């Protein structure tokens, strides 16, 4: 419950500050800079050293990639039918393929299934983060003004993107150095991601013209909250995997849109208005669809 109150409080606070002009209109850019350069890399240093590498992590890790690739393909096809621009296409792909696996996911996994299953949720979260830092950035780059992107340019942007650098550095250092003494620092820094990202969304959130965007919002949420998790469930059932592994992975994939999608969209000059609307509405609708998914998963197993 605390997390849900925090979600509402931070978004509303951002909207109030924007409406009353109590903050600089470009303040969200400074906030996003902190998130990208400090807070997000700290998440990698907090969780990656704790991952136990085994065959068991393949399904939850691969599922997050499948979820993102499914959104990429479906939104590419949908946008072509609707004759959307590259910018709109990339925005939809970014807003549809990445789940809020930690800030919303962790407390809901604990509430529905118990804290002992958070180990699976953490694998989902880190796989989602790694996918966002790679495929997500490639997707965002494709929505830029340049129709063609050279491999050299793409690799340069990818390898200079702070969260990606954080992931790679954490992977390498944790193999040689015990990072546990610095864990309290990483806990505090990573803890700033959710409230600041939500506050930033509130600063940018606009509902004027939502009717014109409803078809895009609806398509994004249908995939994010229904089709995507269904794909992951079918994959798990087809492979005959352990019940708890499939349940937690599917439930994580059914979470609302990742808040960080807004920060990436702003960084690469995509349609932040559409992204923020999808995030806000998916959080509300997602609470209902997650209840449905819980019942479906109980029935399946």
Walk through the language-model features, giving the residues of each.
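Alpha-helical transmembrane segments of multi-pass small-molecule/ion transporters
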Residues: 1-301
């Amino acid at each position: 419950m605390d997390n849900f109150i925090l979600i509402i409080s931070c978004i509303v606070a951002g909207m109030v500050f924007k409406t009353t002009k109590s903050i600089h209109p470009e303040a969200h850019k400074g906030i996003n800079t902190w998130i990208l350069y400090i807070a997000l890399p700290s998440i990698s240093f907090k969780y990656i050293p704790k991952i136990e590498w085994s065959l068991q992590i393949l399904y939850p890790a691969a599922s997050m990639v499948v979820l993102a690739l499914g959104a990429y393909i479906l939104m590419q096809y949908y946008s072509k039918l609707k004759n959307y621009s590259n910018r709109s296409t990339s925005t939809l792909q970014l807003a549809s393929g990445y789940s809020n696996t930690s800030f919303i996911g962790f407390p809901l996994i604990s509430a529905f299934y118990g804290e002992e299953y958070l180990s699976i949720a953490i694998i989902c979260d880190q796989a989602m983060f790694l996918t966002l830092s790679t495929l997500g950035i490639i997707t965002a780059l494709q929505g830029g003004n340049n129709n063609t992107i050279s491999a050299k340019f793409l690799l340069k942007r990818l390898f200079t993107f702070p969260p990606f650098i954080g992931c790679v550095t954490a992977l390498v250092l944790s193999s040689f150095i015990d990072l546990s003494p610095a864990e309290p620092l990483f806990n505090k820094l990573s803890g700033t991601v959710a409230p600041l990202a939500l506050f930033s969304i509130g600063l940018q959130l606009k509902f004027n013209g939502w009717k014109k965007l409803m078809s895009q919002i609806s398509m994004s949420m249908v995939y994010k909250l229904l089709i995507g998790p269904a794909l992951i469930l079918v994959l798990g059932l087809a492979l005959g995997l352990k019940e708890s592994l499939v349940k937690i992975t599917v439930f994580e994939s059914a979470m609302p849109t990742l808040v960080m999608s807004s920060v990436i969209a702003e960084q690469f000059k995509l349609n932040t208005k559409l992204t923020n609307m999808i995030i806000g509405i998916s959080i509300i609708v997602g609470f209902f669809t997650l209840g449905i998914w819980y019942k479906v998963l109980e029935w399946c197993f």
